[in-house]
Amino acid sequence: METLLHAKLLLSAEVESLKSGSFDQTYVKKAEHIISGESYQLVQQFVDKFKGKISISGEISTSSVIAALNDFLNVEVFKMGQENEMLFLAIALLQTFIQNNYTGPAARLKAISGLFGKTGIEIGAVNTALSRSLAIMGQPAYEFMDDPLYLVLSLLLLERITGQKSLFDVTPDQEIPLPIISAESTPGLLAVAYWWWARALLTQLSLIPEPSGFQASVASAIYQSADLAYAITKELPESIHEDFKRELCAMYYLENVKCSLAINTEHLCLPSLTRAKKITNFEFVMTGARATRTKYQQKAHAGLIILAKSFTFQNFALRTTSATPETFALESDLLLEKPHFESIADEPLDEQIYSKRQKVDLNEGYEEDKLLPLALRQENIPKLLLDLNPNDQPTLSDYDNIQLLLRLYTIKNTTPAKDPLVEEELTALLSRILYQNGDKNWSIFARSLWERSIIETTKAKTIERGLLQMQSLVEELDLKIKSKLVPSSSEINVASRLSYIHQLPFIPRWQLDATLAEKYMSLGILKSAVEIYERLGMACETALCYAAVGDEKKAEEILLQRINENDSDARAYSILGDIKQDPSLWEKSWEIGKYVNAKNSLAKYYFNPPPKSGAQPNYSATLKHLNDSLRQYPLSFETWYFYGCVGLQCGKMQIAAEAFTRCVSLDPYHALSWSNLSAAYTKMDKLKEAYSCLKRAISCDAQKNWKIWENYMLVAVKLNEWEDVLTACKQLVSIRRDKSGEGSIDLPIIEKLVELLVTSEYPEEPQQLSYFQKSCTEFICNTLPQVITTSARCWRLVARVELWRKRPWAALECHEKAYRAISHNPDLEVEEKVWNDTVDACEDLVAAYESLGEMEGKYGPGSLVCKDWKYKCRSTIKALMSKGKGRWDDSPGWDRLVEARSQI
């Protein structure tokens, strides 16, 4: 029953459901406190029980404080056989830390003074040491967080419960074993502990500016497989409803996505989002509908809308009713509060999405396996959604709202910033969450308001509302701000704020304030931005603020002051190195904290040294620094990609192959990585491997990348995969024809395809044609003529295929076009080579008239291909001689024309 109780705690289940089971009521009471947002009561009991029990030997420092905590836990707290008790304590500590730093309002406890028995200045020193203990790879955690003791204790307890090596004792040069979780062999309670440990590690990662270190690797390993959830569900009583297990699995996939977003592996999000969507039976689609956006708009115009409906609602999660965050009306003289959509079924055919998208295959009108399933036409909208009122859609379940938010974050992390179309998609997602009736969860609603405000602050007509909303949301977390726009409310439901905090990406309260400062900075309000950064104690961000406006001297002063105050801040050294372009500062950053960005900066410096340095590119040094960086943080896709590109450039194909192999394992859908991996294999004479990589590349989103298709074509030629060569040729022409015209045609390859095509006899019945013959004929005879403009060589190839098809009239027409293409060359009268080429074309055309003219024509027996072919021969020769008369009379080409005329 312990596993069931903890499963309910993971889900933040209804408190009443705990009382109905045959649970140990002592643990039920603890679970009630945690689920109801009263974790601080368990923490207070813990502090009261062990008051003054932690003693620090010697000077107060990070190492001495961690050593004291370890001794305290080993002697006083952690007892074998009491893992369940310790797990509740670890959860309560984590939840209290999150409440104090992420959701608010803070629970003011005096834990440090109680446990350590310290007062005055010593409390501040212990708090600073605890904050610094949460640093990762030279990146200090935010120093002014509240109660870091709670998170440190929670992490230490969870490490003991799971039996894993403590990450507080690991040096950057060491290697640690990653957790392995099995659905069959891992006990359910241990799986629960792993789950909470991953949550705590993601909390720690959110305290630093950039994800790195062992914490990211361990969290990723825990969330790697759904065995984490299955290890728990296998131990649940048979009487437990299947819906409960489904909710647990759905929550796992949501947190898996959150983890991927947190450690910058967002390309892994889509499979988990797809599984979560299936488990919750969530139906949604993005499509187009006509809408009015202004008060005086007479005609509605097409826009994007998310149609969504929940078919499964959480039956076990805590249902909370609380005041939603303060919202601000737009109060615009022009814009409506929200777009008013007309009926989906009334969308005119010429205003549907596909009419605005070029080259869309209308047979694929519904794209489901995307971050945003897309219906290009009305008939492609799922029937379950087609009847929805776009202005009054039904309430979504909390899990489905979270899915939309997670898809929004994934899109933001994988698309260019400030892209108008992307912003329209994000706005459609947020509108679906915000504009729905029914109860709203505080955290979900507040996060949606925050993301909407970030978009609105980029637009002139909505910037005022956006800034006010951001300021209001910052204040609602109960920050220590002297003057507030919104009065504090005493009716705050902490449980509502905490219920989905582990499924939504973490945003600490100071990060909200820092984002507000970034907005001020983007608007040129430097003073307000600097004031916020200084209030938050973010020296590095303040320096970057000044550097962004060109005041690098001031930025250097701030960073030097920061280094004097905390000489272990590797990030400050690295940023100072970025500003001064000084390799010694990056080396210092790496020396004191193994800060991976310092090594990345060194690699970029030696790859492309600044002109004033006088240095030459040093690829060996670049590879060395990148290798050091990747040893510390092997989850960085960008670093692996750069590593591979450098390997390609300096001819080290083994390194390039290794790097791009890691890239495609991190992001299996990155077409350029597959293409570059194939390039490395090609150089290593591993053509089959290169061919397989290119097949993966073109199966990814590479429809517009002609270089990938060209590489695919060339490797396929070497392997004699002629059907794939043909496919690549067709795709190359399709992609490049608008910009390059007939330059998109690879003539040597086309000639080889034609040679292969005409070696066999043309069958009597068209149905007997093979796939290659049909496809190649269609390409040569239908596609190429639309592209050819001046290439006589191309027209001759088309003529050859037409003759093979037993269409001599079409072949003769191609010969005529070939001659016209070259005879209209303006250089005909000045360059003898052009003159001779034209004479060759004329002779070819005359020969074609002679050989094809008397064949059976297009209209069957009795008709000829060209009845007056002799006349056309003479006319063609005469016309060319008139162009060359007076300039090429004495040339060999002229003599050939005279001879040809005499032989007719």
From Swiss-Prot:
Fetch the Pfam families from UniProt. TPR_8 (PF13181)
Its induction note reads: Target of SBF and MBF transcription factor complexes that activate gene expression during the G1/S transition of the cell cycle.
**Where does it reside?**
Cytoplasm; Nucleus
Q: Which PANTHER family match?
A: TETRATRICOPEPTIDE REPEAT PROTEIN 27 (PTHR16193:SF0)
Q: Which GO terms describe its cellular component?
A: cytoplasm; nucleus
The record's annotation in PROSITE patterns points to: TPR (PS50005), TPR_REGION (PS50293)
Q: Which family does it belong to?
A: Belongs to the TTC27 family.
Keyword terms, alphabetized: Cell wall biogenesis/degradation, Cytoplasm, Nucleus, Repeat, TPR repeat
Q: Does the keyword Cell wall biogenesis/degradation apply?
A: yes
In terms of one coarse class, where is the protein primarily found? cytoplasm
Could you tell me which residues the TPR repeats occupy?
Answer: 510-544, 563-596, 603-636, 637-670, 671-704, 706-739
Q: What is the protein name given in its UniProt record?
A: Essential for maintenance of the cell wall protein 1
Something else the entry says is: Present with 8070 molecules/cell in log phase SD medium.
This molecule's function is given as:
Required for the maintenance of the cell wall integrity.
One of the GO biological process terms: fungal-type cell wall organization
> Does the keyword Transport belong to this entry?
no
